[in-house]
């Protein structure tokens, strides 16, 4: 069982004595910076020259510096930029300013676990990862609640790495809900597996195949969209609220019986075998190498996939149907704007 830490286990004063730099001001970056500031922490934001986020950060009352300047000033540096850009930014702008005793933090372990970022031995290296999108991290904090999170220590040079991580987690509100202790290896490998096999890759492929089967059988694309994509949220929300048992309790007997008797025919032993293969590719570093080389080449494979998927009929049908749903437009605008609340 995982060890879980709460507010009582975290000393926020430990962080208030230090200067914190948030590198990046996207979904997570804006939430971390604002929550830490509101918790009484000395925060600055490090952004690339010409960043479109500068005006938003300054508009929120935050001090904005270059990545190098922020890293030089800070004792605690949280890296919240995309995985594929972290190595270059780290090597050129953060590493030169990592003096002894500083703490380097990440919200995802990819670049540490797969040895793309190599911190010096005299700094703390740790992970603090809220298990929710940035706008939710911010809103829950503002409402006096918090998002569950993860904490992990890769390198404890000062003897205080975990304490710093817990203080940071408290500063952004995660210890209000509970923070689970993990490792960089576990966070990275399970996160990638979940994305590829279930949450993104698996779910998207299942939805698209279901849509195609119905359309190919002569049903209206609009009906196929509603049944295979739109209503997925209704089911996932039930799982989210109470697990599989609550979902099955909440649906019709017809749907429940079909779940038990037909679901395993769609996602069967062969699917599980492929999941095992995907996990081995992650554990062995094969996916990481493939992704790194893809980005070094300029992302040609990603570009082809994006173009092909954007042209799939489900996208055009979905756009037309979503235009009928005012609540979706409002929710999308709200969640995409860091300053919306």
UniProtKB/Swiss-Prot annotation:
Record domain KARI N-terminal Rossmann: where: 1-182
**What are the GO BP annotations of this UniProt entry?**
isoleucine biosynthetic process; L-valine biosynthetic process
What are the record keywords, sorted?
Amino-acid biosynthesis, Branched-chain amino acid biosynthesis, Magnesium, Metal-binding, NADP, Oxidoreductase
Q: Residues in the active site?
A: 108
Q: Where is the KARI C-terminal knotted domain?
A: 183-328
Q: What class of enzyme is it?
A: oxidoreductase
Q: Which NCBIfam families match?
A: ilvC (TIGR00465), PRK05479.1 (NF004017), PRK13403.1 (NF009940)
State the family named in the UniProt similarity comment for this chain.
Answer: Belongs to the ketol-acid reductoisomerase family.
Query: Would you tell me the protein name for this molecule?
Result: Ketol-acid reductoisomerase (NADP(+))
Q: Which organism is it from?
A: Anaeromyxobacter dehalogenans (strain 2CP-C)
Recall the taxonomic lineage recorded for the source organism.
Bacteria, Pseudomonadati, Myxococcota, Myxococcia, Myxococcales
- The primary gene name is ilvC
